Amino acid sequence: MALNLRKNHPLMKIINDSLIDLPTPSNISAWWYFGYFLGICLITQIITGLLLAMHYTADTSYAFTSVAHMCRNVQFGWLIRNLHANGASLFFVCIYLHIGRGLYYGSYLNKETWNIGVILLLTLMATAFVGYVLPWGQMSFWGATVITNLFSAIPYIGQTLVEWLWGGFSVDNPTLTRFFAFHFLLPFVIVGMTLVHLTFLHETGSNNPLGIPSDCDKIPFHPYYSIKDLLGFALMLILLVTLALFNPNLLGDPENFTPANPLATPPHIKPEWYFLFAYAILRSIPNKLGGVLALAASVLVLFLIPLLHVSKQRSMTFRPLSQILFWTLVADLLILTWVGSQPVEHPFIIIGQLASLAYFTIILILFPIASALENKMLNL
């Protein structure tokens, strides 16, 4: 009998074990789409980004005009740019939903997978930040100035570190050049880390909505979930193309249509929408170092989540108190996102401070208390 190439060829065997014959729980819901979506987003971003890099000039004198030239004179350059810019937003929508899913269903108990995932999120945030600087519009320039300046809050080495990062005494040509280099490199780092993420995931297998072991009832990934994923893929594609074709500038900042000018500060400096929650936490502390620490903690707190799990159940499916807290946390993040987009004045300052306090309180204090209470109520 001839050998089955798919199962025996060294390379195809890896693909087969990851995408075709992968044993998958039979009851995973649409919330498990998002890992696949993120992979699609990453591939799309790398392809569109590569096409953009072919026409982009990483120089302060030409960056803005090279982007304009791309949109006007390159075949479908406008479409490639719109897909790349809005693809980034979609990427963050997917990763936030993916993290939310992991939080709700207790997927974070696969500690290695979760920790690599948090590092992936940090790398993605760094990639998006340096990418936002490249068009060299007003918000690009001032966003870069404000965010890189935060490193100066580090005691003793801060100022030296910032000047080293800038390559001079302000954000200028060397900064733009190195940011382009980082923006080109980091997606490939993300690809490598994604493979590590998947390797750890396939060690334990996927979690499921009930949070119980599913070894006794698994089905092959293909054809069941490969077909199911196509529906999600179609919906995601419709969303991205609709956004890119009908309202490509909806999520951008109008200030970025003005070339960078170090002598004119925009009235309200703010990052892209997907960083606003962290930006609101940063602004809610009236001390520079304190704000920077809170900003870092807002994402790094995810590393603590597996350590704070005290419930005897893995998933929140049958834990009403934790569910209430979870959806309160979601609402709190939406409030933080909204506050981050508003000017620094009353009442937004106090709302931001209360929402920031609530964010850390829910994660670090209320979740463990609710879990312990549920254990007690259920006599577990």
From Swiss-Prot:
Any one annotated GO CC term: mitochondrial inner membrane
Coiled-coil residues: none
Keyword Heme carried by entry: yes
Binding site for a ubiquinone: H202
Pfam families: Cytochrom_B_C, Cytochrome_B
Miscellaneous field: Heme 1 (or BL or b562) is low-potential and absorbs at about 562 nm, and heme 2 (or BH or b566) is high-potential and absorbs at about 566 nm.
Name of this protein: Cytochrome b
